Amino acid sequence: MPIVDSGSVSPLTAADKTKILAAWDLVYKNYEKNSVDILVKFFTGTPAAQAFFPKFKGLTTADDLKKSSDVRWHAERIINAVNDAVKSMDDTEKMSMKLKELSNKHVKNFNVDRKYFKVLAGVIADTVAPGDASFEKLMSIICILLNSAY
């Protein structure tokens, strides 16, 4: 299923959750490296998104991005937010609350264009479980919630 960022998707099934956890655990066990790789891939594929991060100004190459402590810090925040969602799959109210709070922060404090959530979700899904409908469903749920304040 392609990742969507509006409307609704069916709830995660027990089988979805099992697949998601298996794939996620493989990536998250090396979250420092994988988080940076994901964010660098996002910025190199979508350079306009980097404009929302003043601290990343002047980081023009993948190598520059990988070496930046600010990039590493933000990459870990992103992967930990996804990890929180993965760990909250059985508590959708908790997941919803946290992601809606994150949505509000990105609107009010950072004025981030919401289209980038879906792009980043695609990079994450391609890294964690390429082509896996269960993981794409989770990323759709995350995107829909991140768009809630827009």
From Swiss-Prot:
The keyword Iron applies. One of its GO terms (molecular function) is oxygen carrier activity. This is Globin-3. InterPro entries: Globin, Globin-like_sf, Globin/Proto, Globin_lamprey/hagfish. Gene3D superfamilies: Globins. Belongs to the globin family. Pfam families: Globin. Residues 11-150 form the Globin domain. Monomer. The keyword Heme applies. SUPFAM superfamilies: Globin-like. Heme b binds at H74, H106. Keywords: Heme, Iron, Metal-binding, Oxygen transport, Transport.
